[in-house]
Regions:
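Acidic, PIN/NYN-like endoribonuclease modules and their adjacent C-terminal/linker elements
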Residues: 1-3, 36, 100-138
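Short, well-structured N-terminal submotif of metal-dependent ribonuclease cores
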Residues: 1-38, 50-62
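Anionic group-transfer/hydrolysis microenvironments
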Residues: 9, 44, 116
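Glycine/charged-rich beta-loop-alpha catalytic/anionic-binding loops adjacent to active sites
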Residues: 24-29, 65-67, 82-85
Length: 138
């Protein structure tokens, strides 16, 4: 089974039936999923924002959120010092750099809908292929 690191943007699309849901389902199929522990908080915050924007959908949103546990995502500890260094290098938030750090540490594909995070991941992969970059966090 292939390891993949999944970020909150991808999980929110998956749980809340967003337009990109099918794309995410295809990318995650058959994978062993991993994420930093902050994933749960980010997804819960997205659920809260959706409830505030659409109070009439509260119950449906809570039911969708409750299916997060069924996804069997391994929540991993992050080396915060290395994630901070990576955030500074890539100009990402520490939150986003945590996903990027984990993908590097596990040598796993990063599944995200966040354009800035995806660009940083691509740039790091390209640099590591050329032997001049950050190939692994470990």
């Amino acid at each position: 089974m292939t390891d993949k690191v999944v970020d909150a943007s991808a999980i929110v699309a998956l749980l809340f039936n967003e337009l990109t849901q099918k794309k995410i389902v295809a990318r995650l199929r058959g994978a062993s999923l991993h994420a930093p522990g902050l994933l749960e908080f980010e997804v819960a915050n997205a659920c809260l924002k959706k409830m505030l924007a659409s109070p009439g959908e509260r119950q449906m949103l809570l039911e969708a959120f409750s299916s997060l546990n069924a996804l069997s995502i391994a929540l991993e500890r992050i080396n915060l010092a290395e994630a901070i260094a990576l955030a500074r290098r890539t100009k990402l938030t520490l939150y986003d750099a945590s996903y990027l750090w984990l993908a590097r540490a596990l040598d796993a594909e990063l599944v995200t809908l966040d354009d800035k995070l995806a660009r940083a991941d691509k740039a790091l992969r390209r640099a590591s292929e050329q032997g001049s970059g950050y190939s692994s966090a470990r």
